[in-house]
Amino acid sequence: MDLIETVNACVKLQKRVLGLAPNTNLNTAEQSVLNDYNALPSRVNGKTYALLNQIAVYTPYTINAPIISLAVRISTDDYDDMRSGIESILDVLAAAIRTEGSRPTRVIERRVLEQNVKQLVDDLRLKSLISDLSIANLAAVDTAMIQPEVIETENPLYADIIEQIVHRPNIGMNGGNIRATLGRWSGNKGVVTCMSGMDSEHRFTVELKTRTCGIINIVYIPTAGTILIPMPAGRNREGDLIDVSAEMMADDFAIDFMDDDKIIQTETGVGVYSFPMCNRIRFRINPWNTQKDDDNLGTVHMINWAQGTAPKQPAISFMFETRRTFTEGNYQHLSRCAPKAQYMMDTQFNDVSFTNRPAVDWNIQSLLTSNTQRVWCQKIAMLIAAFAAKI
């Protein structure tokens, strides 16, 4: 963890240095940036460390970070020296990440054990517990140093499918006397088709990974002309569908936001809804019923629907998408910072830059969620994420 904290601190210092401007008068806060920067070169300028380069070869890295004279006005040359100095330190830290990341570990370690990396951390003597990228903060959460961070998650839903088939005797050749609910969802989107070959409510639940709040958008989409119906027993059937979304009323489509088995909030009709903290979303849908059939709202292809012999069956399809969803961060959730960490992983920390690495797909999501050599995978992901917070 102390290498992560050192990277956090140096990244924050880099942002402060880049926040200055040459040939302008410095206020008190900006002069403190000079002092904080000079503290590093005074300890590490000219020192050399043997660490792994991008092809996993131990290479001598020498820090070139000149000390800047204190002044109320910083020159262009001094500014360039500061900028190149902090970049030199970050380059060495990148090599330290490759070196430390190559060492397997089974538990979260508070101190670095790799000798050359330990020497670098001790020389820099600069640490910060938190990073701007939430992935880098997970070790501090696991060790109870900080509370779990509230993040905007990109994948609140478990990947799942639904194939819910209910039927009565005398199944029709076109899906009559069958109620079929077919669909799938993952990440933050899902698509479901509900075919009503008989008067019966479609009811199913979408599980969230953890208690989450946010916004959900639900919209009807054109339904398929013909679908395969996977029967629980016997040969599969097919359903010839007719889209009846034009006759759907708000009460025909209900969404229950639930905390376990308790209903927290209910909305009716498609649209955009803000939902409270919940871990389940239950849909209750009735595309067609006897009342609509008696009111002659169907077409000629829906004659004898109640008897199960109609040429076509009423159906609707809809898509739902969760947006701006917030929850407590953990290893299962992908936040908006994950692509930035992945970019750094693909450029400076590719798989060949480690002398030893876990046997998983080389991407941030696989490292965070792997059950194989879990702590080692997570350590590498957090180290890369801490470095990825740099400008």
UniProtKB/Swiss-Prot annotation:
Its main location: virion. It comes from the Viruses. GO terms for biological process: fusion of virus membrane with host plasma membrane. GO terms for cellular component: viral envelope; viral intermediate capsid. Belongs to the rotavirus VP6 family. Homotrimer. Interacts with the inner capsid protein VP2. Interacts with the outer capsid glycoprotein VP7. This is Intermediate capsid protein VP6. It comes from Rotavirus B (isolate RVB/Human/China/ADRV/1982). The lineage of its organism: Viruses, Riboviria, Orthornavirae, Duplornaviricota, Resentoviricetes.
